[in-house]
A protein has these predicted regions:
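Terminal substrate-recognition subdomain of acyl/acetyltransferases
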Residues: 1-74, 179-246
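Acyl-donor binding region in acyl/amide transferases
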Residues: 18-25, 29-31, 117-118, 129-132, ...
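A short linear-motif detector with a strong N-terminal bias
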Residues: 19-21, 29, 56-58, 100-102, ...
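A conserved beta-strand-loop-helix scaffold within acyl/acetyltransferase catalytic domains
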Residues: 40, 68-154, 185, 245-246
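Generic alpha-helical secondary structure signal
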Residues: 61, 99, 164-167, 172, ...
């Protein structure tokens, strides 16, 4: 393992904070250990891995609970060895427009790195393709992107698709967790709804949904970096022996 820090900016006069993105390089034999310590592969800057408030689900809990009920009108199809993105381009454009994102974002970027290690979950409503989800399977399963047309918001397709992904990955019997990238701001509170929820607080995986939601709310309310919360996640009596030694 090699750790890289980018000391981009900070303040130490009237307040005290530093903005320091953290990246790392890992040997293949370290991949699983890296994921278990809050690192995920960087899709756009390989071979770097990045540290963040990652969210994941314990797949064993998905098998132990009653299967999520999905409306009969909704169907899913797993696509491996994807040959073309043409079927998803209109959905992608509509998704960017509805979300208010830069419409110049290219869908191709999601497949530039390790396309053979990714699958697409196609989502159909009454046999019409209306959404898709891109999942990286190796070295760990990561749900990278969900996009849909918002043709019927009441359907909550994103929730149903997430349950489908969890149940599908759990059924394979080869993975212990499913990752859904970092959880920041109000828009990511929904990630705490699912069984087996955990988030990385920088020291360990926590199942505290209330704390996670509070942190997301703080993210969205923050305007000035000087207003950063004084909350300290490390209690005075924290047992540092629990931290993994490399």
């Amino acid at each position: 393992m090699k750790i890289l820090f980018q000391h981009l900016c900070g303040r130490i006069t009237r307040t005290d904070w530093q903005y320091t993105p953290v990246y790392a390089l890992f040997e293949k034999s370290e991949f699983e250990k890296a994921a278990n310590n809050g690192w995920l592969p960087h899709e756009y800057d390989p071979p770097l891995w990045f540290q963040a408030r990652q969210v994941r689900y314990r797949l064993a809990e998905c098998l132990q609970r009653k299967k999520h009920k999905i409306p009969k009108r909704i169907d899913f199809q797993i696509i491996e060895n994807l040959k073309s993105l043409k079927a998803y381009e209109e959905i992608w454009k509509e998704y960017l427009k509805k979300k208010g994102f830069d419409e110049d974002q290219s869908l191709d970027r999601l497949f530039e790195l390790d396309p053979e290690k990714k699958i697409v979950v196609e989502v159909y409503d009454y046999d019409e393709l209306v959404a898709f989800s891109v999942i990286r399977l190796e070295p760990i399963p990561v749900s990278l992107q969900f996009a849909w047309t918002y043709h019927n918001p009441k359907l909550s397709l994103g929730i149903h698709c997430q349950y489908f992904e969890l149940e599908y990955l759990a059924s394979l019997g080869v993975y212990t967790h499913s990752y859904v990238c970092p959880g920041y701001e109000n828009t990511c509170i929904w990630k705490s709804r699912f069984p087996g929820f955990e988030f990385w607080n920088g020291m360990e995986w926590s199942s505290d949904r209330n704390l996670y939601e509070r942190l997301c709310l703080i993210d969205s309310s923050l305007v000035d970096p000087d207003d950063l919360s004084n909350d300290d996640l490390i209690p005075i009596n924290y047992d540092f022996s629990k931290i993994t030694s490399w």
